[in-house]
C-alpha cells in the first residue's frame, strides 16, 4: 500500500484554513446546559438581510419565510399594515420585466391573497407549452434535444456532493447513510460521560481516534466499506482531505464550496465543533480536541467508501469526470433517471422508465425520452396554465392573459418567479410597519419623578421580555419604580457555589470572568481559622464524588421511584415535600472582597499542613494524633527548603535518612508542598473577590447605565431571573441568557453586596452619586415560569427595614399573581377568565409537572428593544414583547453607555429575535422540531430520535401552538430615546450594530427629545420623520 506523501506545512495550513472558512456560514452551537440564543444566519450577517435569507435557504435547505396562509391569518387579525403592503408591491413591481397588458401590482396583490400556499410557477415549465395549454392546443411536436436539456441537470448536479449526485440519478441513500454513519462516530467521540462505552484514544483528537476504530470496525467491513484502504494511505486529517478530494477528482477551485455543502448537511454538529474548538476553557475540548477539518475528514473518508461500494454494485461514478462523462455519453438515461428519482415523474410512466433503465441501452433510453418528455412538458404547461388562469381571474385580468404571446408568457413567468422569492419579505415588512405604528401609538413623552418624591421601592429587572408584564403590574399595584438592565447586572462572575466542585460562569457566553466569588456558610467569620480552612479545601485540586459513599444504590433507586410516582400523580404537592427534604443547604454569604496577603498566606499554610497530614497517613501510616503542630511545621519548612537536616520524624518514628528524603520529595512533587506551587496558589487566590476599585466601578456603571443617580428608595431590589421546568433539556433556554443560560441570582447578590458597602458608597459620593444611609440593595429572583419573586439574603437586612418587609412582599405577591393571570390564558387558551390566585396556583403546578412540554412561552413574540427611560413606555401595555433597557442620555454625555448597550444588549437581543424568527419559519430545519421526539446526546445536545443532526434551534412547543405559529416572525425593532445626531454617532461608532442596521437585520427608531419627541424611523437607507409623541394626561402624571 502506497502512503500519500506527507503534506508540507504550507499545504496543511491551506487545507485547514479552507475548511475553517467553508464552515463560517454555520453559527456556533453551545452545549444545551448553557443554551445560548444565536442567529442561525450569523455567518451571513455581512450580507443585506434579504440577500442573506436567499443564501441561507440554499445552504441549510430551509424555508426562510412562512407559508402565505399564515400571513393572511395575521392580516385578518389586523397585524399587517395594508398601505405598506401596497407600497412594497408597487416598488418591487417596477423591477419586474414589462409585459404588455400586465398590471403587475394587481397581479401581485392577487397572488398574495391567493387561497393556496403552493408556488404559482411550475419548475422547469416552458412558455410555448403554457401558451398552447391556455389556447387548448397540443404542444408543438418537436424532437427532444438532449443537448438543450442537459445543462440544467448538469448545473444542479455540480451543486451537490458526489454522494448526493449519485442519489439523484440512482435513487440511492448514500448521503443519508453517510450522515448516519458519521453521527454514530461523533456521538462516541464527543460523549461527555453519558455513554457507558468510551472511545479509546480520544485525547489524540477526533480524526486520529476515529481512524483507529474505523480500521477495525466490523460493521463497516461487512458492509464493504473499505475505509482501511484510505486510512492506510493518510497520516492526518489534512492529508485525508486532500487524498479523498483528489480521488473524487474535485477541482481545487471548487473545494471550498464542496466543503461548505458537506458541513451544512449536519450544521448542528458543525456548529458545535466550531464553538468547541474556540472554547479555550471548555474542559471536554481541552481533553479531547476536535476541529472542523477533523469533522470534514471523517465525512469525506466515509463518503468515498460509500461511493466505492456503490460503484462495485451499481457501476455508479466515483470521480467528478466520470459523472460528467456519463452525462454527455448517456444524457437521455441521466434525464430519465433524474425524472424517476426526483419525485416529479408522471405516475403512469414510473414503471416504464424503471424497466427501461434496468434493461439499459442508449437507444432504448433515447426512444423512451422522445415519447415521455413531450408528455411531461405538456403536463407542466397545463398545470402552469391552470395556475395563471386562476391568478388572472383574481386580478380581473383574464382577457389580458389570453392575448399574451409565448414571449410575453415567458416574461410573466419570470416576473412571478422573481416575486415569489420576495413575497415573504413583503409580508414581513408590512407586519413590521404595523408593529412600529402600534409601538409609536403607545409610547408617550417620558416624565421625571416629581421633585422630592421617593418611591417606596425601586426594582432592577433583566431586559428579558418576560420582565415587562411583572414590571407593569408592580408599577400599578403600588409606589414602585422599575428599571431594565442586562441580567448579569454588568458584573461577570466566576462562581464556586457551596458544596460544588467546579466553577460556573455567570456572564455572557463571549465573556470569561476574571474574578471568582465563593459561597460560604453565613456563620463563618472572615477572620476565623474555620474560614481559612474552608478556603483551603475549596482550592484543593482533588475532586469530591457526587454521591456520598454511604448512599446505597438501593436508596437512590427508592428515591427515583418516589420521584416517578410523585411527579406524575401530584406534582405540586410532591415538589413542596421534596423541597422540605432537600432544604439542607445552610444560609450562605458570598466572599466578594479581595483577600489580604496575610489571609492568602494563611490559607496556603492551612492547605499545606492538611496535605502533610494526608501524606503522613498515606505514605508512612502515621495518624494525626501521633504528631504535633511543631512536627508538621518542621516538615513544611523542610519541604519549602526553608531549613535543612533531619526532622523529628526520624527521632520519633525511627524513619531512616533515605525514607525521610523520599517522603520530603513526595511532599514536593505529589502533594504540592513547595514554593513554586505556593506561588501558583497565590495567583489562584488572587482571583477571589473584587478590589474596592472594581466594586466601585461596577456599581457606578450600573447606576449610570440605567439613569439612577439620585432619589434612591429605601429598598432597591436587584432582581435576577430563571425559569423552572422538569424533564426538559432546554431548561437553560428559560434562564438568563446574559448569565450564560443560568440563574441571575448570583450576580444580583454580588452587586447588592457591593452596593451596600460603606466604602463603596463613600467613593460614589465623591463621584456625585449620594446613596442615603437608609437605602438597602436587596437581591431577589424572578421565577419566569411561576411569576414568583423571592427575596434573598434577608439575614443581612438591617433591623430598621424589617418593619417594611411585609408591605414589600405583599406588593411583589400581588404583581406576581396579576402577571400570572395575564400569562396563563396565553399558555392555556381554556383558562381565559381566570382569577389571579387561581392563575398563580396553575403556574406553580405547570412548573413542576414533568409531563409539561411548555411550562411557559419563554421569549416568544419578542419584537421590540426599547432603550430609554421607563416613563417612555410605562403607560403602554406591550404584552411581554419588548426588551426594556433603561437608559438616560442626559447621564451619558460622551455616548459611551449607549454604545455599550448597542454593542451588548442590542446585539444579543437581535440573536434572540432571529433565533425565534427562523425557528418559526422552518422549525424542522432551523428549529429543533417537537420535544416529544428528543433524546439527549452526550449530555451536550439533543437529537430527534436516536440518530440525527444536533437540534440547534428552538423546539416547536416554544414557537408553535397546535401546528400554527405562535411567535410572529419580525426583525427586532430597536427604539432609542436620544437626540438623533447623538444616537446616530453611537450607531456609527459600534461597527457591528451599524452593519446590522444598514443591512436590515435590525429596524431602528430614534425618538429625539430635542425635537419635541419626534420619532425617526430608519427605512430604505434614510431616517423618516413621524409625528411627535403625545404627552401623558395631567391626571396620569399627577398619579
Swiss-Prot record:
Q: Where in the cell is it found?
A: Cell inner membrane
Q: What is this protein called?
A: Probable inorganic carbon transporter subunit DabA 1
Q: Does the keyword Manganese apply?
A: no
Q: Which residues form the signal peptide?
A: none
Q: Which InterPro entries match?
A: DabA (IPR018752)
Q: How does it sit in the membrane?
A: Peripheral membrane protein
**Natural source organism:** Nitrobacter hamburgensis (strain DSM 10229 / NCIMB 13809 / X14)
Whom does it interact with, and what assembly results? Forms a complex with DabB.
Residues annotated as binding Zn(2+) = 462, 464, 721, 736
Q: Which UniProt keywords apply?
A: Cell inner membrane, Cell membrane, Membrane, Metal-binding, Plasmid, Transport, Zinc
Amino acid at each position: 500500500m502506497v502512503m500519500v506523501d506527507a503534506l508540507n506545512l504550507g499545504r496543511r495550513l491551506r487545507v485547514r484554513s479552507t475548511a475553517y472558512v467553508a464552515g463560517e456560514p454555520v453559527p456556533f452551537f453551545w452545549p444545551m446546559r448553557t443554551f445560548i440564543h444565536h442567529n442561525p444566519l450569523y455567518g451571513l450577517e455581512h450580507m443585506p438581510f434579504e440577500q442573506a435569507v436567499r443564501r441561507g435557504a440554499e445552504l441549510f435547505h430551509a424555508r426562510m419565510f412562512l407559508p402565505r396562509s399564515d400571513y393572511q391569518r395575521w392580516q385578518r387579525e389586523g397585524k399587517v399594515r395594508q398601505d405598506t403592503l401596497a407600497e412594497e408591491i408597487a416598488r418591487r413591481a417596477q423591477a419586474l420585466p414589462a409585459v404588455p397588458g400586465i398590471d403587475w401590482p394587481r397581479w401581485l396583490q392577487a397572488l398574495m391573497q391567493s387561497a393556496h400556499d403552493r408556488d404559482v410557477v411550475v419548475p422547469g415549465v416552458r412558455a410555448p407549452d403554457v401558451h398552447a395549454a391556455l389556447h387548448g392546443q397540443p404542444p408543438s411536436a418537436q424532437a427532444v434535444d438532449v443537448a438543450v436539456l442537459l445543462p440544467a441537470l448538469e448545473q444542479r448536479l455540480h451543486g451537490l456532493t458526489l454522494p448526493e449526485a449519485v442519489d439523484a440519478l440512482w435513487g440511492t441513500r448514500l448521503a443519508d447513510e453517510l450522515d448516519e454513519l458519521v453521527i454514530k462516530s461523533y456521538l462516541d467521540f464527543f460523549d461527555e460521560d453519558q455513554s457507558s462505552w468510551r472511545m479509546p484514544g480520544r485525547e489524540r483528537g477526533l480524526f486520529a481516534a476515529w481512524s483507529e476504530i474505523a480500521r477495525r470496525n466490523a460493521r463497516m467491513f461487512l458492509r464493504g466499506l473499505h475505509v482501511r484502504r484510505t486510512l492506510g494511505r493518510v497520516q492526518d486529517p489534512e492529508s485525508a482531505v486532500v487524498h479523498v478530494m483528489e480521488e473524487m477528482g474535485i477541482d481545487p477551485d471548487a473545494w471550498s464550496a464542496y466543503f461548505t455543502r458537506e458541513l451544512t448537511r449536519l450544521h448542528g454538529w458543525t456548529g458545535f465543533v466550531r464553538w468547541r474548538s474556540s472554547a479555550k476553557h471548555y474542559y471536554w475540548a481541552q481533553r479531547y480536541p476536535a476541529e472542523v477539518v477533523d469533522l470534514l475528514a471523517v465525512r469525506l473518508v466515509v463518503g468515498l467508501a460509500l461511493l466505492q461500494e456503490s460503484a462495485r454494485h451499481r457501476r455508479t461514478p466515483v470521480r467528478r469526470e466520470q459523472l460528467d462523462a456519463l452525462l454527455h455519453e448517456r444524457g437521455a438515461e441521466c434525464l430519465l433517471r433524474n425524472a424517476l428519482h426526483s419525485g416529479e415523474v408522471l405516475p403512469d410512466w414510473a414503471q416504464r422508465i424503471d424497466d427501461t433503465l434496468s434493461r439499459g441501452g442508449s437507444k432504448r433510453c433515447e426512444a423512451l425520452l422522445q415519447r415521455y418528455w413531450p408528455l411531461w412538458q405538456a403536463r407542466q404547461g397545463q398545470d402552469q396554465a391552470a395556475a395563471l388562469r386562476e391568478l388572472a381571474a383574481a386580478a380581473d385580468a383574464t382577457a389580458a392573459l389570453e392575448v399574451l404571446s409565448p414571449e410575453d408568457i415567458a416574461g410573466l413567468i419570470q416576473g412571478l418567479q422573481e416575486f415569489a422569492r420576495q413575497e415573504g419579505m413583503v409580508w414581513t415588512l408590512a407586519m413590521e410597519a404595523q408593529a412600529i405604528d402600534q409601538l409609536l401609538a403607545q409610547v408617550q413623552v417620558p416624565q421625571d419623578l416629581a421633585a422630592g418624591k421617593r418611591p417606596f421601592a425601586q426594582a432592577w429587572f433583566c431586559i428579558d421580555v418576560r420582565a415587562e408584564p411583572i414590571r407593569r403590574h408592580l408599577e400599578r399595584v403600588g409606589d414602585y419604580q422599575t428599571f431594565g438592565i442586562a441580567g448579569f447586572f454588568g458584573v461577570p462572575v466566576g462562581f464556586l457555589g457551596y458544596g460544588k466542585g467546579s466553577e460556573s460562569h455567570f456572564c455572557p457566553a463571549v465573556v470569561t470572568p476574571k474574578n471568582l466569588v465563593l459561597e460560604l456558610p453565613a456563620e463563618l467569620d472572615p477572620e476565623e481559622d474555620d474560614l481559612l480552612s474552608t478556603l483551603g479545601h475549596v482550592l484543593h485540586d482533588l475532586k469530591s464524588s457526587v454521591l456520598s459513599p454511604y448512599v446505597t444504590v438501593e436508596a437512590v433507586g427508592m428515591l427515583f421511584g418516589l420521584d416517578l410516582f410523585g411527579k406524575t400523580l401530584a406534582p405540586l404537592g410532591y415538589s413542596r415535600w421534596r423541597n422540605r427534604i432537600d432544604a439542607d443547604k445552610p444560609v450562605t454569604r458570598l466572599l466578594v472582597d479581595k483577600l489580604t496577603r496575610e489571609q492568602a498566606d494563611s490559607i496556603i499554610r492551612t492547605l499545606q499542613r492538611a496535605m502533610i497530614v494526608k501524606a503522613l497517613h498515606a505514605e508512612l501510616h502515621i495518624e494525626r494524633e501521633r504528631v504535633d503542630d511543631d512536627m508538621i511545621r518542621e516538615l513544611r519548612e523542610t519541604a519549602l527548603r526553608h531549613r535543612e537536616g533531619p526532622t523529628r520524624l526520624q527521632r520519633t518514628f525511627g524513619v531512616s535518612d533515605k525514607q525521610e528524603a523520599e517522603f520530603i520529595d513526595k511532599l514536593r512533587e505529589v502533594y504540592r508542598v513547595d514554593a513554586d506551587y505556593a506561588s501558583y496558589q497565590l495567583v489562584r487566590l488572587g482571583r477571589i473577590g473584587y478590589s474596592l476599585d472594581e466594586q466601585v466601578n461596577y456599581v457606578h456603571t450600573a447606576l449610570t447605565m440605567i439613569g439612577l443617580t439620585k432619589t434612591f428608595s429605601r429598598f432597591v431590589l436587584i432582581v435576577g431571573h430563571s425559569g423552572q421546568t422538569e424533564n426538559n433539556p432546554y431548561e437553560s433556554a428559560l434562564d438568563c441568557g446574559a448569565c450564560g443560560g443560568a440563574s441571575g441570582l448570583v450576580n444580583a447578590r454580588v452587586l447588592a453586596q457591593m452596593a451596600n458597602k460603606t466604602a463603596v458608597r463613600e467613593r460614589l459620593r465623591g463621584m456625585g452619586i449620594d446613596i442615603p444611609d437608609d437605602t438597602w440593595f436587596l437581591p431577589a429572583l424572578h421565577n419566569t415560569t411561576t411569576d414568583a419573586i423571592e427575596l434573598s439574603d434577608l439575614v443581612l437586612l438591617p433591623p430598621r427595614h424589617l418593619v417594611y418587609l411585609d408591605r414589600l412582599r405583599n406588593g411583589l405577591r400581588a404583581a406576581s399573581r396579576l402577571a400570572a393571570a395575564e400569562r396563563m390564558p396565553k399558555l392555556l387558551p381554556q383558562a381565559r377568565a381566570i382569577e389571579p390566585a387561581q392563575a398563580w396556583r396553575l403556574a406553580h403546578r405547570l412548573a413542576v409537572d414533568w409531563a409539561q412540554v411548555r411550562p411557559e412561552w419563554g421569549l416568544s413574540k419578542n419584537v421590540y428593544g426599547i432603550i430609554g427611560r421607563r416613563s417612555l413606555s410605562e403607560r403602554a401595555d406591550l404584552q411581554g414583547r419588548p426588551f426594556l433597557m433603561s437608559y438616560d442620555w442626559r447621564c451619558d454625555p460622551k455616548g459611551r453607555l449607549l454604545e455599550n448597550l448597542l454593542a451588548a444588549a442590542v446585539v444579543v437581543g437581535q440573536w434572540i429575535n432571529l433565533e425565534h424568527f427562523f425557528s418559526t419559519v422552518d422549525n424542522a430545519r432551523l428549529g429543533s422540531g417537537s420535544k416529544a421526539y428528543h433524546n439527549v446526546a452526550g449530555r451536550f445536545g439533543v437529537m430527534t430520535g436516536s440518530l440525527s443532526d444536533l437540534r440547534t434551534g428552538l423546539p416547536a412547543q416554544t414557537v408553535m401552538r397546535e401546528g400554527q405559529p405562535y411567535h410572529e416572525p419580525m426583525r427586532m425593532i430597536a427604539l432609542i430615546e436620544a437626540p438623533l445626531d447623538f444616537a446616530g454617532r453611537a450607531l456609527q461608532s459600534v461597527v457591528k450594530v451599524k452593519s446590522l442596521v444598514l443591512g436590515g437585520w435590525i429596524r431602528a427608531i430614534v425618538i429625539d427629545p430635542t425635537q419635541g419627541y419626534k420619532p425617526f424611523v430608519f427605512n430604505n437607507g434614510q431616517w423618516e420623520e413621524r409625528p411627535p409623541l403625545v404627552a401623558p394626561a395631567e391626571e396620569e402624571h399627577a398619579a
